[in-house]
Amino acid sequence: MTSEQALLVLGIETTCDETAAAVVERRADGSGRLLSNIVRSQTDEHAPFGGVVPEIAARAHVDVLDGIIAAAMNEAGVAFASLSGVAAAAGPGLIGGVIVGLTTAKAIALVHGTPLIAVNHLEAHALTPRLTDSVEFPYCLFLASGGHTQIVAVLGVGNYVRLGTTVDDAIGEAFDKIAKMLGLPYPGGPQVERAAEAGDPNRFAFPRPMLGRQDANFSLSGLKTAVRNEAGKLTPLDPQDINDLCAGFQAAVLESVADRLGAGLRLFKERFGPPKALVAAGGAAANQAIRRMLREVAAKVQTTLIVPPPALCTDNGAMIAWAGAERLALGLTDTMDTAPRARWLLDANATAPAKFANTRAGF
């Protein structure tokens, strides 16, 4: 299989609380075309618990995945026999869901004699902008997906160098925890963003974590604690209190992330030269305030900003299919004994930053 061939790939995503399948075409020139993208969210199943329950998530994937795949194939107008490959997210993620998706992909591949591609969920986010915008390597990636917040130099398919990472909470986690703390509905991230629009970001003097450091790492646990402390002083909270707390929290996150991205882009330029673009991927990139901040950061360093459409920032099958197609074009396929993985580094040689060896920063 070579990059001179057009490739049709089915992608399956089940790492968390979205059941998704999609079909993409990778043309001979390396450009992409999305033929279908079906996503079924489990929000209603998890809302009563205020967060994702792994057992419920896995069972929901089992219940609906076959139908989601059938819908994706039907919308694309593609038969299984026409596929060049079938890709599934093999991690990182909730292991029950990962098993469901990967096992289903193996069955399809086995029955139809189709190559299997086991995709790293984070790599799929990292490569999505090449589907939507045909961006060339190397580019600087701001990845904010689930429990991950990282700045990564994307040098090629399978070639990633981490420039910065969170040493505690990821951005998405912090938004969700603040929402739960303030009694906002699940999923919390969009609720905090919505409340912040009606709030005063200057009412509370929240800290701006890691500001001015030479490294490009993130930390949000102290900010989260500061919000909790201020909320505790105001009990019971009225709606405007909640709006102002969310606005202050989001403003602090934006300033901190902008500073950390500035450091990351400087490190990128020192090691690899100017990036072809600043790229954002992952669910947090769907936040409109974060998108505005990213535009300002990109303008400041005079680089192009690429952010996929919101539907391709959150978890979806298209990104898995595309990553599978990119790998397949290089002849990278997997065997039937490929194991699902709850943890899977995007950059295999990464080590925790100095002084943070005992934190999650190495993951």
Curated annotation (Swiss-Prot):
GO biological processes: tRNA threonylcarbamoyladenosine modification
UniProt cross-references to Pfam families, sorted A to Z: TsaD
Cofactor note: Binds 1 Fe(2+) ion per subunit.
Xref: PROSITE patterns: GLYCOPROTEASE (PS01016)
InterPro entries: ATPase_NBD, Gcp-like_dom, KAE1/TsaD, Peptidase_M22_CS, TsaD
UniProt: Fe cation binding residues: 121, 125, 315
Keywords: Acyltransferase, Cytoplasm, Iron, Metal-binding, Transferase, tRNA processing
Enzyme Commission number(s): 2.3.1.234
Major localisation: cytoplasm
Catalytic activity: L-threonylcarbamoyladenylate + adenosine(37) in tRNA = N(6)-L-threonylcarbamoyladenosine(37) in tRNA + AMP + H(+)
Enzyme class: transferase
The protein's role, per its UniProt record: Required for the formation of a threonylcarbamoyl group on adenosine at position 37 (t(6)A37) in tRNAs that read codons beginning with adenine. Is involved in the transfer of the threonylcarbamoyl moiety of threonylcarbamoyl-AMP (TC-AMP) to the N6 group of A37, together with TsaE and TsaB. TsaD likely plays a direct catalytic role in this reaction.
PANTHER family: TRNA N6-ADENOSINE THREONYLCARBAMOYLTRANSFERASE, TRNA N6-ADENOSINE THREONYLCARBAMOYLTRANSFERASE, MITOCHONDRIAL
Protein name from the UniProt record: tRNA N6-adenosine threonylcarbamoyltransferase
Gene: tsaD
